[in-house]
């Protein structure tokens, strides 16, 4: 690529790889402008890379870029390759042990584009179905109570001692984690840089590792 497009914070994380390439960066909540710029530059013949954190197809920019490309006349649409990455749920799971070994659901608590009632319903159905639940965007200043509300919903279907893993800055410098329980979750430090993994009915903790059995006869 000769042009790098992305959220300023993510561009800073890969600055050592960019070298002398042209950079187009902007801030939070400017995703459409950012991706439209990338599509426009690509349509002009440039090789453009759009930077996402984690995996671009999991709450990243891959979907939006592909949607915007579809708005162009077919003959003007640039080729687009999605490069897979390592999403926070998987990075966090590796730090915690093996909590995602069975079926799991990934739910973002950000209600910028999804109604809060719909998010709560998804959490309810995931808990009722006994999925391990990986939670993205668990808390912010404007959403201080959302995680507690989700916890209360899950407690209708899980025991209070259900293991819960909390990983902060997954895959980044300063990454740290702790293993707690559903009952004690409100006491733990959780912020926007955290990923929360709530175990299922069979999840357990051994030697400091959070483990969800797959069902093998060991």
Each model region followed by its residue ranges:
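Class I S-adenosyl-L-methionine
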Residues: 1-80, 186
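A contiguous loop/helix-start segment that scaffolds small-molecule binding in enzyme catalytic cores
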Residues: 48, 128-218
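Class I SAM-dependent methyltransferase SAM-binding "motif I" and its flanking Rossmann-like core
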Residues: 58-129, 200
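Short, surface-exposed amphipathic charged segments that create phosphate/polyanion-binding patches used
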Residues: 37-43, 94-98, 120-123, 177-183
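Short, well-ordered secondary-structure micro-motifs
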Residues: 17, 61-62, 92-94, 117-119, ...
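Short, active-site-adjacent cap segments at secondary-structure transitions
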Residues: 11-14, 57-59, 89, 171-174, ...
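Structural motif
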Residues: 2-3, 21-23, 46-50, 79-81, ...
